[in-house]
C-alpha cells in the first residue's frame, strides 16, 4: 500500500500522524491541511473525513469485451462495451478501476499478431504464467474521450518480469487483461480522476510515451473534437521504434484538420528498416532541446 497515491482523503479529526510511506505523495503543506492516503490510515477511534464530491458519483458496470488488439509489441488496446442505456460520465484525463478475479493465465494463450511475436519468442515470454488466488483491482486511464460514447478504451502494457529473471511474478492485472477475448465480461468502476485540463487559453504541451498514450489521446481528442479548442497544442510522443508507434493516422488527421495542433515522435531505438529521419532519443530531452529551451515563456504552458 501507499505506492500509487490515488486514495487521498482530507482528515479533519483523528487518524494520527502522517506516515513516511505517504510523504512521497503528500507535501508538508498538504499534510498540515489534513491530506492523507486512506490506505495508510489506521482507524482506531472515531474520525471526521472529507471526500471529494465526485466520489459519490462512482458506479460499477459489468461490461463486455468488444476487442483486445495489439497496438504495439507490449501494448494492447482493450475496448469495452458499456451496458445498453448506461454511460460512464467521465472527463478527459479520467480513469476507471478494473476488477480481475482469481485466475491462472498462460502467456502461450495470448493472441499476439505475427509482427510482434519475434520479441516475445526472443525473451521467452510465451513460457510465462500468472497465478493469482485473490481478486485484484487496478486503475487505468481512458484512451477514449467523452463523446466516444458507450465504450471504455484502455491502453494496457503487459508487466512482464525482467528477461534476466523470469522467475519473478508477472503483473497480476495486465496478465488478466491480456488474456481477455471478445465477448468476455469485465467489471469496472468509476469515473475517477484529477488530471483534467484547465479552462484557459494557455498553450498546451502534452508529453508521454508507451501506454502513457491513453490520457494524451483522451485530452487531445477532447480539446480538438469536442471543444473545438483554438489553444496552441503540441504533442510529443516517445516510442522505441517505428513498430511501437500507434494512433499515427489519428494524430496525422488531427494535425491536418487543426492548424493549432502539431505532434512529434522521437524514437529511442530506431531500427534500420524504419528509415527514420525524425527525432531520436528520449522524448523529454527532445522536447526540451527542440522546443522548450527556446520558448519565450515555458512556465505559462499547461503540461
From Swiss-Prot:
Chain intervals for the UniProt region annotation (Catalytic): 201-303
Superkingdom of origin: Bacteria
Main location: membrane
Alphabetic keyword roster: 2Fe-2S, Cell inner membrane, Cell membrane, FAD, Flavoprotein, Ion transport, Iron, Iron-sulfur, Membrane, Metal-binding, NAD, Sodium, Sodium transport, Translocase, Transport, Ubiquinone
Positions of [2Fe-2S] cluster binding: 4, 7, 39
Purpose: NQR complex catalyzes the reduction of ubiquinone-1 to ubiquinol by two successive reactions, coupled with the transport of Na(+) ions from the cytoplasm to the periplasm. The first step is catalyzed by NqrF, which accepts electrons from NADH and reduces ubiquinone-1 to ubisemiquinone by a one-electron transfer pathway.
Assembly and interaction partners: Composed of six subunits; NqrA, NqrB, NqrC, NqrD, NqrE and NqrF.
Family the UniProt entry places it in: Belongs to the NqrF family.
Protein name as annotated: Na(+)-translocating NADH-quinone reductase subunit F
Organism this protein belongs to: Pseudoalteromonas haloplanktis
Organism placement in taxonomy: Bacteria, Pseudomonadati, Pseudomonadota, Gammaproteobacteria, Alteromonadales
Amino acid at each position: 500500500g501507499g505506492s500509487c497515491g490515488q486514495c487521498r482523503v482530507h482528515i479533519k479529526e483523528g487518524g494520527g500522524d502522517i506516515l513516511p510511506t505517504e510523504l512521497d505523495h503528500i507535501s508538508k503543506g498538504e499534510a498540515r491541511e489534513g491530506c492523507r492516503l486512506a490506505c495508510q490510515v489506521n482507524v482506531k477511534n472515531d474520525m471526521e473525513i472529507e471526500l471529494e464530491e465526485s466520489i459519490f458519483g462512482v458506479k460499477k458496470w459489468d461490461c463486455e469485451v468488444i476487442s483486445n488488439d495489439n497496438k504495439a509489441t507490449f501494448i494492447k488496446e482493450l475496448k469495452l462495451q458499456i451496458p445498453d442505456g448506461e454511460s460512464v460520465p467521465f472527463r478527459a484525463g479520467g480513469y476507471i478501476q478494473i476488477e480481475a478475479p482469481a485466475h491462472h493465465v498462460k502467456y502461450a494463450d495470448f493472441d499476439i499478431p505475427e509482427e510482434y511475436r519475434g520479441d516475445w519468442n526472443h525473451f521467452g515470454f510465451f513460457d510465462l504464467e500468472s497465478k493469482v488466488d485473490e481478486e485484484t483491482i487496478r486503475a487505468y486511464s481512458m484512451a477514449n474521450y467523452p463523446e466516444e460514447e458507450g465504450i471504455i478504451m484502455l491502453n494496457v502494457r503487459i508487466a512482464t518480469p525482467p528477461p534476466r529473471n523470469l522467475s519473478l511474478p508477472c503483473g497480476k492485472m495486465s496478465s488478466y487483461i491480456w488474456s481477455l477475448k471478445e465477448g468476455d465480461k469485465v467489471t469496472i468502476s468509476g469515473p475517477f480522476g484529477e488530471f483534467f485540463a484547465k479552462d484557459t487559453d494557455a498553450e498546451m504541451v502534452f508529453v508521454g510515451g508507451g501506454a502513457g498514450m491513453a490520457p494524451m489521446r483522451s485530452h487531445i481528442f477532447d480539446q480538438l473534437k469536442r471543444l473545438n479548442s483554438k489553444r496552441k497544442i503540441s504533442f510529443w510522443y516517445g516510442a522505441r521504434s517505428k513498430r511501437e508507434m500507434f494512433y499515427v493516422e489519428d494524430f496525422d488527421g488531427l494535425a491536418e484538420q487543426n492548424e493549432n495542433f502539431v505532434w512529434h515522435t522521437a524514437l529511442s531505438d530506431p531500427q534500420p528498416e524504419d528509415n527514420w529521419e525524425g527525432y531520436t532519443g528520449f522524448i523529454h530531452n527532445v522536447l526540451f532541446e527542440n522546443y522548450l529551451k527556446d520558448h519565450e515563456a515555458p512556465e505559462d504552458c499547461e503540461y
